[in-house]
């Protein structure tokens, strides 16, 4: 049986997979579940993983696969079969296969590689005319391009210097999503996006860095993170 928070989290992950094709970030899960810290998300994910509901895909950030799903919430209404506090925070489950239709494992597509992007202070986003071969299974629907990550400000999100960030083109994003933000029409950076009191805040995922705050007209969303590729030397 799952706790109510575990049930809520797996439902949220499934919803985001169906909507966007990628699992939510830890920041998005923290906000969706109204948790105070990302450590609470880590504990919930570890518990779901131990119980065989999800698994983390190796060498990929924001890569969660649902293996089975909770079906019925126990507690309240006609389905309440338990009593007291236990019934209010525990859910009964029936296993069900996750609805995933992965691309053939050998399918490779080439997407544009547009230079380097800062996971630190903003740097110029280069428009190099190169391409990057990517397993099709890593990409969902939409138009994509790649940027090579420079810096360490997103390491707590599993994004490291030298990684290739796979970006889905879009000019809009929700709070808490990792985006490519063009600042003052000349510099690009990879950060969590937040809107706060009429300002735009670009948050790092590294306690050594401070958030960057701008007026809305200074920041243009040019895409959001869809996946990562990493080279091992």
Curated annotation (Swiss-Prot):
It is an enzyme of class 3 (hydrolase). Belongs to the peptidase S24 family. GO terms for biological process: DNA repair; DNA replication; negative regulation of DNA-templated transcription; proteolysis; SOS response. PANTHER family: LEXA REPRESSOR, LEXA REPRESSOR-RELATED. The active site is at residues 153, 191. Residues 26-46 bind DNA. Disulfide bonds: none annotated. NCBIfam families: lexA (TIGR00498). It comes from Erythrobacter litoralis (strain HTCC2594). Its EC number is 3.4.21.88. Homodimer. The record marks 119-120 as: Cleavage. This is LexA repressor. CDD domains: S24_LexA-like (cd06529). Represses a number of genes involved in the response to DNA damage (SOS response), including recA and lexA. In the presence of single-stranded DNA, RecA interacts with LexA causing an autocatalytic cleavage which disrupts the DNA-binding part of LexA, leading to derepression of the SOS regulon and eventually DNA repair. Keywords: Autocatalytic cleavage, DNA damage, DNA repair, DNA replication, DNA-binding, Hydrolase, Repressor, SOS response, Transcription, Transcription regulation. It catalyses: Hydrolysis of Ala-|-Gly bond in repressor LexA. GO terms for molecular function: DNA binding; serine-type endopeptidase activity.
């Amino acid at each position: 049986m799952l706790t109510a928070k575990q049930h809520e989290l797996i439902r949220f992950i499934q919803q985001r997979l169906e909507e966007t094709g990628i699992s939510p970030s830890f920041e998005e899960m923290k906000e969706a579940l109204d948790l105070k810290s990302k450590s609470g998300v880590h504990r919930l994910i570890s518990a779901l993983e131990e119980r065989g509901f999800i698994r983390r895909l190796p060498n990929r950030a924001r890569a969660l696969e649902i293996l089975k799903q909770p079906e019925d919430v126990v507690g309240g209404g006609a389905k309440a079969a338990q009593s007291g506090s236990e019934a209010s925070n525990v859910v009964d489950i029936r296993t069900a296969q996750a609805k995933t239709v992965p691309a053939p494992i050998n399918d490779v597509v080439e997407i544009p590689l547009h230079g380097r992007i800062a996971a630190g202070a903003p740097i110029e986003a280069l428009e190099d005319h190169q391409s990057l071969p990517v397993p099709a299974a890593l990409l969902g629907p939409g138009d994509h391009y790649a940027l090579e990550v420079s810096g360490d400000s997103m390491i707590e999100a599993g994004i490291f210097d030298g990684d290739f960030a796979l970006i889905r083109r879009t000019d809009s994003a929700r709070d808490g999503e990792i985006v490519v933000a063009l600042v003052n029409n000349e510099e690009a950076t990879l950060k969590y996006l937040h809107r706060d009191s009429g300002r735009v805040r670009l948050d790092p995922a590294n306690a050594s860095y401070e958030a960057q705050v701008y007026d809305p007209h200074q920041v243009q969303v040019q895409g959001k993170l869809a996946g990562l590729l990493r080279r091992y030397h």
